[in-house]
Curated annotation (Swiss-Prot):
The gene coding this protein: tef
Listed result of changing A292S: In strain: NC357
Keywords noted in UniProt: Cell cycle, Chromosome, Chromosome partition, Meiosis, Metal-binding, Nucleus, Repeat, Zinc, Zinc-finger
Organism of provenance: Drosophila melanogaster
Name under which the protein is recorded: Protein teflon
Impact upon substituting M122I: In strain: MW11, MW27, NC301 and NC397
Region span, Disordered: 78-126
Lineage, broadest ranks: Eukaryota, Metazoa, Ecdysozoa, Arthropoda, Hexapoda
GO BP annotations, alphabetical order: male meiosis chromosome segregation; male meiosis chromosome separation; male meiosis I
Compositional bias per record (Low complexity), positions renumbered to this chain: 88-104
GO cellular component: autosome; nucleus
Amino acid sequence: MSKFLDMLSGSQCVSLEKCGDVVVSTNDCMIALYCHFCRDLFTQLPEFLRHLQSNHSDVLHFTKEHNVYSVEELLSGEQGKAHEDAQSAGHNSSSGDSSSLMNSEDSRAIEGSEDNSDNSPMKPEQIGKQSEINLLAEVTNILLQTNDKELKPENGVFNRPRKKANNESSSLKICDLKSHTIARTSRKRMSMVKNRILRVLDSDLSAKLEIKPPEPNSKLSITEPIQEDNIPGTCFDTPTKPIPSSSQLSVRKSSLTEANQICTKYAEKKTAPTMPKLLNCVPKPILTSQQAHTNAEISEINETYHLAASQVTKTTKTFPVKITQIDILQPVKLPKTLITPINEEGVSDQVENSTNNINNAQSLPKENTKKFFKKRSELGIKAQGSPNKFFKIIKSKANPIIVKRVQTTSAKASTNKIQIRSNDKTNCFASEFNSTKIRKLKMENCVDLKSEDPCANTNTRLNKLATISSCEILKAVGLPAITDNPIEDTLLPDELETIRKKADQFIKIYRKYDSIWNYRKICPPAKPDFISQQIFALTREVNKTMLCNLANSDIKGIINQISVWHYNIYTQYIDLDTISENARYTLKLFSFLPVSFAYFCKCCDDIFILKKEYLKHLISHQVRFQCTKCIKVFKYKGYYEKHLRNAHS
């Protein structure tokens, strides 16, 4: 084929130009032609050629107007005679139904003409009867033909097209297709007519065969008295349904009677002789079905009422309180700074002073209120045995915990033993109890980066707080200026020099582990297992060189505090003049740190970039879940997260 195209292109009389490509879709099993000029698809070759001639003749420079023909048009000249023969045959027999009808009509017309020719002229009555007979014959012929044609597909499947007389070789034309559609629609209509006729015939037969039942309201005229002996025993009428008994109607009655018997037995055990009983032994008259149904419902209601009345209510017995003895304990000797003895005459004056102090405490500045905390040891604890007894626990630095027991019988007697704190203590208590904003600030500051470990066991956590504080951990590394700025005033110059030497040693070691302090800038970021190994190596080296005993959690806390402090200084634009000398010195040491950093969890190997996620993770390690904004405590993590979504989102 390529050689043939080369020969054509080599000759000067033939010019070839690429107009399209063949496109094949394997999913749909379709072939189409793609036009290069307008980027359109055509499923047939003649359409594509006509499209080129009509739309792209200016590009292709066709020499003739009609130089594109379809295969059908080319073959039309050869088969012209065959088409003419087919048309004549189609006009003669357009469809099988029409030909059969014409033949039947011709046969009937010939028979009628023969009869008319043989016989004498007919009367009008005979003509009408004969026309009716002819119509019935036509209808029966049509019905028989349709029945035969409908039964053929059921008996056997047609695998071949239907044969037609004188049209086996010729192809179908438009007129033939029209005749086929006309025949098909006529068959459908005749089948509908046939169904209607059959329905009417069936209805007429059923109407004739039906026996009308006698009317229910009709009465027979009785002229003689009825004799019961002459009435036969058999009756052809439908027997009446038996009247259901009361036991069948009231289904719940049996269960109610059983429940009533159980209640009566239970009442007899408790010696309650006045229990209502049901009287079911009275003989009931025979009732109709409606009356029996209504009586059964009424009996159910009455029985349920008796059952409700039979229940015994439990009453609680209350006895008046009798005071047998009043013991007044001796007053315990306590220091005057904590507790002052109060007489009965001065109680009202001190209560008024306490209320004034509480009102004044609300107007205190926030700086003074931050120093005071409410202690559990100063609160009153009620005794579990009696509601009139309580213990008052007071804790001081000089003396251990002192418990004073106060026993009272009424509110008036208890005023003699009430002891009120001094004015300073009441101010502290009121200011701490009434200022929720201060507590919010405390929680937010504490949760930002806690120096203590958020471990699950509270006992170990408290022991760790008692032994080592955050400032002491930072002192071991030489970085106390991160949290406590005015520490230089309390330290001697020799101590400051030793702290700075420790800081230099720690920073030299810490600078080696760039995968920890430069975690966010390393691409791709290191895996948590590798970073946990690096932190373990860092702690081991720090403990060896600086002669201290720090855990991995302590090193993680120091790293988090250093990164947060460095980030706050650079983001808040703090002047260097306002910072202490020790803080400036440490800031110069940490000049290699980037601004972006990551949070390392103390209890596990997780690493967080966002602060919110880190705080949520810290709370998940604690026993209770506490909100940092509204100071609510939750038992489970799901409740806490739902509260954050609903209240603070």
